[in-house]
Amino acid sequence: MNPFNPDAYCGIYCGACSIAMHGETGRADGFAACLGSVPTEELICGGCKSDTVYAGCSTCSLRHCAREKGVAHCVDCADYPCKMYSRWQSVAKFLPHSREAVSGLAAIKRDGADLWLAVQKKRWSCPDCGTPFSWYAPECHKCGHKLVSETYKIYGWRKLLCRFVLPAAYRKGKAKSSTA
């Protein structure tokens, strides 16, 4: 697997991705737990800008578009915000971490990707011990520091949605990769 790249085309910080964290630590947070039907050995990802992408993300239309156009981020495209990005946002809003994409792109455009990545790395690291944590981790797996105010929760209808939509995205990605 190539080195992990936490940068994403859409403005999400892949460094706090539950699937990437699971691949690194073997621990499943609330988000990764929604993927119960996905084989554990497939919960790995090098980030959406890598060649080793989790099957559920491999079919992302934004990723394919940005790669085709040769842009580092959607905000670098002359068509941004386009219909594709707006459609993705209307669906992505159901997953709390995805809501940060637009503000992430604004920060990338304003401050540059390197500064944005540094800020995100600090934000998604435990304030007590510096260990990285995922969007949905309730506490630091190393020191036990409570992270509830700094992370997202999946509960109620979102948890139900998560249990169906995420495995469906995985199956779609696997089906597409097996026919390629």
What name fits each language-model region?
Residues 36, 115, 119, 177-179:
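Contiguous alpha-helical segments
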Residues 104-114, 127, 154, 163:
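Short, C-terminally biased terminal segments at protein or domain edges
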Residues 45, 74, 126-129, 140-143:
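Short cysteine-rich clusters marking metal-coordination/redox-active sites
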Residues 65, 82, 144-154:
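Short Cys/His-rich micro-motifs in 6-15 aa windows
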Residues 1-4, 176-180:
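Basic/polar N-terminal segments that are highly enriched at the extreme N-terminus
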Residues 66, 126-133:
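Short Cys/His-rich zinc-binding micro-motifs
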Residues 85-87, 152-162, 166-177:
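Short metal-binding segments enriched for Cys and/or His
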Residues 1-111, 122:
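Hydrophobic scaffolds flanking metal-cofactor catalytic centers in soluble metalloenzymes
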